[in-house]
Amino acid sequence: MSIRVIIAGFKGKMGQAACQMVLTDPDLDLVAVLDPFESESEWQGIPVFKDKADLAGFEADVWIDFTTPAVAYENTRFALENGFAPVVGTTGFTSEEIAELKEFSRAQDLGGLIAPNFALGAVLLMQFATQAAKYFPNVEIIELHHDKKKDAPSGTAIKTAELMAEVRESIQQGAADEEELIAGARGADFDGMRIHSVRLPGLVAHQEVIFGNQGEGLTLRHDSYDRISFMTGVNLGIKEVVKRHELVYGLEHLL
């Protein structure tokens, strides 16, 4: 039996890539799409909804969310309330929101996934960086994205920093008497690590994790040149969440 899928934010670039992936997979069935600004009532013969409230009671298994940080939490909560296992690529969740959604998913006996990045290479980068941080506590992150991205730093950069912070010796980097001549020049501070965000047209999603030690350096980098790079992870997420009973944060928990 096919897994019935709803896609929220289907008009965006990630939403469109997800639609094409679902439509070409015989194990998946795209049963509805959601976008508050869509004027048509159908898209490729699939019903279009403008208000998520109209999807209450709809027969579906999985809710894919590529919307905006402003509505992602409400959408994920709505999905769980209505029996849809969420697969969420929208970023901007607080740690408190993620914890609350995990608890609620267990109460609903539903699987779910919030993933800062669906590219398998990016997930591996985070794992490699976590291993390196045990031995190289001096580290900075540079994340680069297209100029339409609404949040900074990226969810991937935050997740990477969180994972490294769990194993890294906590130190304050840079000179003790360091002075920023322009505010923000040293980037955002996360437990002594610095995160730098670049936003330029022509980019998709890229991240470097740069480690330094006496007389040596180590640089890890991942590049997504096309949004198709995320679809393997989205597909995996759809097929895994329907088997599970709680929401997880990070694609690595499903690998």
Curated annotation (Swiss-Prot):
Name of a matching Pfam family: DapB_C
Q: Which pathway does the UniProt entry assign to this protein? A: Amino-acid biosynthesis; L-lysine biosynthesis via DAP pathway; (S)-tetrahydrodipicolinate from L-aspartate: step 4/4
For this protein, what reaction is catalysed? (S)-2,3,4,5-tetrahydrodipicolinate + NAD(+) + H2O = (2S,4S)-4-hydroxy-2,3,4,5-tetrahydrodipicolinate + NADH + H(+); (S)-2,3,4,5-tetrahydrodipicolinate + NADP(+) + H2O = (2S,4S)-4-hydroxy-2,3,4,5-tetrahydrodipicolinate + NADPH + H(+)
Q: Which PROSITE patterns match?
A: DAPB
Q: Where in the cell is it found?
A: Cytoplasm
Q: What is its EC number?
A: 1.17.1.8
Gene3D superfamilies annotated for this entry?
A: Dihydrodipicolinate Reductase, domain 2 (3.30.360.10), NAD(P)-binding Rossmann-like Domain (3.40.50.720)
Q: What GO CC annotations are associated with the protein?
A: cytosol
One MF annotation (Gene Ontology) recorded for this entry: oxidoreductase activity, acting on CH or CH2 groups, NAD or NADP as acceptor
Q: Does the keyword Lyase apply?
A: no
User: What is stated as this protein's family in its record?
Assistant: Belongs to the DapB family.
PANTHER family hit by this protein = 4-HYDROXY-TETRAHYDRODIPICOLINATE REDUCTASE 1, CHLOROPLASTIC-RELATED (PTHR20836:SF0), DIHYDRODIPICOLINATE REDUCTASE (PTHR20836)
HAMAP family tied to this protein: DapB
Supply the name of the protein.
Answer: 4-hydroxy-tetrahydrodipicolinate reductase
Task: Please tell me the species this chain comes from.
Answer: Streptococcus pneumoniae (strain CGSP14)
